[in-house]
Structures are given as C-alpha cells and as structure tokens.
Amino acid sequence: MNNDNLHDKLTIWRQQQIELKGMLQLIPKFQSLNEIRYVVGLDISFDKSSPKAVSALVIYDLEQRMIIYKDYLCIEKLEEDYVPGFLSFREIKWYLPLLNHIPHQFRIDIILVDGNGVLHPVGFGLACHLGVLLNLPVVGVAKNYLHCVGLTESLDAHRETLKKHVLKKTTDHPILIHSIDQSSEILGAAVWTSSNSKRPVYVSIGNQMNLEQSIQLVQKCSSSHSRVPEPIRQADIYAKFVLSQSKRNKKN
C-alpha cells in the first residue's frame, strides 16, 4: 500500500474512533468486584515464520481460579499491518466471531484484552472498541507502554519514571499515567501485578469500568506465574498451543 492510500485509510479509521468514542460508557456497571466472577481473556499469537496467527478466547472462573471454556480461530493472514493507535482495526475482527460464538449457558461478566483502552492517542483503543461494539465491560491490559505523542511522556522519560519507582521499592503501588497537557487527565496506570513482577502491565478503562476497579480486577486475576493476568495469559498459552499443533500437523 502506498503512502497516500495508507494516509486515507488511517484518516477514515481515526474518524471512526472519534465517532465511536461518543458511545463509551465510563460509569461502572459493578458496585463491587465481588459481582465479577466470569472473566473473558483475549489474545492473538503470531507465527514468526509465516503470516498465520491464532486468536484465542478463554472464560476464566475467578472464584474457582480455572478455565471453564475456551475457543480459537485460525487466521491464514492478518489483513492489516500493525499501526500504533490502530490495533483494533487489525485484531478486532478476529475476536468478534469468538465472542459471538460463546454458548448461551456461559455468562460473561467482563473482558480483559491484550491492548489499550483510553490510554490511547484519541482515548479509544482496542478495549474501548470492543466494549462499545458489544456493550460490555472491558479492561485494556497492554504488555508495553504506548507513547502517545503530545499526550503522554516519551518512552525514555517513562523508563526513568519506572526506574525511580522500582528503586523506591514502591511497586506494590501503581504509577498513574497522566496526560502531559493542561488537563493532566489520568489515562491509565502502570501496574505490577505481583511481588515477582519485574515489569508492569498497562491498565486502562475500556468500557463500563473506572480505573480503580480496573486495577483491582487485574491484580485479583493475576498470580505469581506471570505479570500478565491469568485470563489473558491463558488465552495466549492456548493460542500458542494451537499454532504449534497446526505447524506440527502440517509437517506430518
């Protein structure tokens, strides 16, 4: 795709994000985290040697600490390249069939997805996009920091912030991520999910949640095994397993 076509596409996508942002619901659905039991985790695993990928969904029973349902979708080729700030247009179409295919006997309380929510250049990341389309509570949990030019501190500055925080041994408290403009709006948080975590995950509101609830839920869903909360971690493990089995079967 040439630069002109890409620019036109991104302009259309940005307009869609801005329009859909008006449908965000930032008033929490839940009065207490005790109302949340069934947590959907979503992730995509990519084959490093081919265009193939696998999207995976798990339903995690937070009370029993176990997976009660899982599904996957094999992707021959992702149709869009990754462009920072436009992840939803690359990945959301591979999540929606899985979400729409969940049997009716399973209840969904909330979704955790590998990606950002309002911590985003226009405040409408993948987690927000999913939440608006499905009218469900969603929390964005990104593994890496997304620098939003003119909105959040640079990557180098953020690394210094993390370093100081770790040296103070205050990783049991999240770092709130503020916008650097005059509003100083809180966009999300860098969260260490356990005492074993060397790096944080980046938590932000997707839909029908507030940030305090979102942070508490991510911590509640996490274990000492990984900095990534279990619903997303288990979806990632499952996607990688399906991808490896597919490659093994092809060789045989």
From Swiss-Prot:
<feature type="binding site">
    <location>
        <position position="114"/>
    </location>
    <ligand>
        <name>Mg(2+)</name>
    </ligand>
</feature>
<keyword id="KW-0539">Nucleus</keyword>
<dbReference type="GO" id="GO:0003727">
    <property type="term" value="F:single-stranded RNA binding"/>
</dbReference>
<comment type="similarity">
    <text>Belongs to the endonuclease V family.</text>
</comment>
<dbReference type="GO" id="GO:0016891">
    <property type="term" value="F:RNA endonuclease activity, producing 5'-phosphomonoesters"/>
</dbReference>
<keyword id="KW-0963">Cytoplasm</keyword>
<keyword id="KW-0540">Nuclease</keyword>
<keyword id="KW-0255">Endonuclease</keyword>
<dbReference type="GO" id="GO:0005634">
    <property type="term" value="C:nucleus"/>
</dbReference>
<feature type="binding site">
    <location>
        <position position="43"/>
    </location>
    <ligand>
        <name>Mg(2+)</name>
    </ligand>
</feature>
<keyword id="KW-0479">Metal-binding</keyword>
<dbReference type="GO" id="GO:0005829">
    <property type="term" value="C:cytosol"/>
</dbReference>
<keyword id="KW-0460">Magnesium</keyword>
<dbReference type="GO" id="GO:0006281">
    <property type="term" value="P:DNA repair"/>
</dbReference>
<feature type="site" description="Interaction with target DNA">
    <location>
        <position position="82"/>
    </location>
</feature>
<dbReference type="Pfam" id="PF04493">
    <property type="entry name" value="Endonuclease_5"/>
</dbReference>
<keyword id="KW-0378">Hydrolase</keyword>
<dbReference type="GO" id="GO:0005737">
    <property type="term" value="C:cytoplasm"/>
</dbReference>
<dbReference type="GO" id="GO:0046872">
    <property type="term" value="F:metal ion binding"/>
</dbReference>
<dbReference type="GO" id="GO:0005730">
    <property type="term" value="C:nucleolus"/>
</dbReference>
<protein>
    <recommendedName>
        <fullName>Putative endonuclease C1F12.06c</fullName>
        <ecNumber>3.1.-.-</ecNumber>
    </recommendedName>
</protein>
<dbReference type="InterPro" id="IPR007581">
    <property type="entry name" value="Endonuclease-V"/>
</dbReference>
